[in-house]
């Protein structure tokens, strides 16, 4: 009998330890996780910046990339998220007009440039200027860019080509991609001879090369606004401030983005 008592006592103690340990674990607050919806052209740089943010704050940021139009519609439809980063002002304005973002948190992060690209092995030389021979350069091929009706890069492309007087010649020869990375893929795979994308996208794909850069005065400034959503976690505004702050500048420069003044 005494033997059983001696055996049961440590077992009871272990059970109590496990029970209290389970309660402590259950009561430990769960760390917040931010869901960031961002324009596809930010894929590489935000991967690095989100890691820096988590390292300094302990708050992970889960990233989801698509065309700004797709993400804005997703938010409007009630999709759960904390931060939205657009490739143009229009889609951010769209959400702000519907009170879906925290206006006070809104920041313009960086800028970009618009470029004409070709497959890396292309020998094409073409200077972008008023009336330049884009249609001739395409030959029987097509031009890939974002859908001008919805995708920011496509809107910038249409504006630039209209300003230069060549839009009407190629408007019916577009491959209308759903985001800038998809547009670039058509060129990198050699499916089309030319495409219009952002300079930062061209810089990360060795299978394409920049033919020329569009003059900045041919289109609206390419800027990336960011904001916390109205129903976001408290850390969302701090994440936006981090992206717009001094600590993030080195990463933005590394990936070729243009510094701007808010």
Task: Tell where the protein language model's regions lie, with residue ranges.
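Bacterial N-terminal signal peptides
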Residues: 2, 10-22
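Exported/periplasmic ABC-transporter solute-binding proteins
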Residues: 25-79, 86-89, 93-112, 117-262
């Amino acid at each position: 009998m005494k033997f059983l008592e001696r055996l049961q006592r440590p077992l009871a103690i272990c059970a109590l330890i496990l029970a209290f340990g389970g309660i402590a674990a259950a009561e430990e607050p769960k760390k917040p996780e931010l869901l960031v919806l961002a324009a596809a052209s930010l894929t590489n740089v935000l991967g690095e910046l989100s890691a820096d943010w988590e390292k300094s704050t302990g708050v992970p940021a889960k990233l989801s990339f698509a065309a700004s139009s797709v993400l804005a519609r997703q938010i409007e439809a009630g999709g759960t998220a904390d931060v939205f980063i657009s490739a143009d002002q229009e889609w951010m304005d769209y959400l702000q007009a519907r009170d879906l973002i925290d206006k006070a948190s809104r920041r313009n992060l960086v800028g970009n440039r618009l470029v004409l690209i070709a497959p890396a092995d292309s020998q094409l030389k073409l200077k972008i200027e008023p009336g330049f021979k884009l249609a001739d350069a395409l030959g029987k091929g097509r031009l890939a860019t974002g859908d001008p009706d919805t995708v920011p890069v496509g809107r910038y492309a249409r504006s630039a080509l209209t300003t230069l007087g060549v839009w009407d010649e190629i408007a019916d020869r577009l491959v209308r991609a759903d985001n800038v990375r998809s547009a670039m893929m058509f060129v990198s795979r050699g499916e089309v001879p030319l495409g219009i994308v952002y300079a930062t996208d061209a810089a990360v794909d060795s299978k394409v090369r920049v033919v020329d850069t569009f003059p900045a005065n041919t289109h609206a400034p390419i800027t990336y606004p960011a904001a916390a959503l109205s129903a976001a976690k408290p850390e969302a505004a701090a994440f936006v401030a981090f992206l717009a702050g001094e600590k993030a500048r080195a990463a933005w420069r590394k990936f070729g983005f243009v510094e701007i003044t808010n």
